[in-house]
Amino acid sequence: MAKLGVIADGISQNFEYALDVMNEFELEYAELQFLWGKEVGDLNTAEVNKVQNLVNAHGVKVSCISRHIFGGLLVGEMQQDNSVYLEHLDALRRCIDMAKVLD
């Protein structure tokens, strides 16, 4: 059987409310993009810990951390000395770190 989930901010960027709705509809998996007005990868350590506590309390699993990384960059901008490229690379690292915490 297919796994049932939802992009959480499609319900609301208020993550607690989104989790309540997910529980109401028995949705087990949450894809995270925007929480509390921030894009994932921009959450601080306390906010990531709050996400972890909330998903555990609601019995939900995180299926995907989805950030708009490298979107809009031109091929010529994909260079290690390009500051915008490096910002996107840092965002990718933060998302990977968040995924490890939520695993």
Ranges and model annotations:
Residues M1-V101:
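N-terminal pre-domain/capping segments
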